[in-house]
Amino acid sequence: EAVDRAAGYLSDAGYAVAAATTPSVDDCAKAWFRYLGAELEAFLMPLAREHGSETIQQIFEWYFEMGKTADPVDYRLGVKNRSAMTRQWNEFLQDTPLVLAPYFLQPTPDWDCDQKSLAGIRDVFNSAIYSTGLNWVSLPAGVTPIGMIAGRPAGVQIIGRRYREDMVLD
């Protein structure tokens, strides 16, 4: 609903808005989770264990329970695959320089949903695939509020070409 509402606003403002099939967002999000997890485990977790609150330590524990993170060999393959995914997106964005996408695939969750349960944090990551996945392939995105949906504030994001943040912000 948020994307449709934003598309209407953009169309009313004179922008050409058309449906398009993008490269896989889901594959990018899964890769982000698996390979960023390896970086978190190696570099951030020692600090979180030493200095982090019980809440943040629990959130990280649930994060690592959600799936397997990469070992060093798998991580190198993941970085290689990231280059291929980035290329697919770059090629797509040559003809479609901006993409209107949801920020969450569900209504905005409670502010503390990631602190409540493994299921809650899983729901957040599963519904935020456009954010995490496109972060994995280093695409700029601007998030903007679109109003209230289902009694919650909602937003969309405009995704652009690499190094063309100016187009996202225009």
Predicted feature descriptions by range:
Residues 1-13, 76-80, 87, 136-170:
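Structural helix-boundary/capping segments
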Residues 35-90, 143-153:
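Short helix-loop capping/hinge segments that flank enzyme active sites or metal/cofactor-binding pockets
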Residues 90, 121-144:
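Small-aliphatic-rich amphipathic alpha-helix that forms the alpha element of a beta-alpha
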Residues 96:
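An anion/phosphate-binding loop that grips the pyrophosphate of nucleotide cofactors and donors
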Residues 1-34, 69:
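Gly/Ser-rich, acidic/histidine-flanked active-site/gating loops
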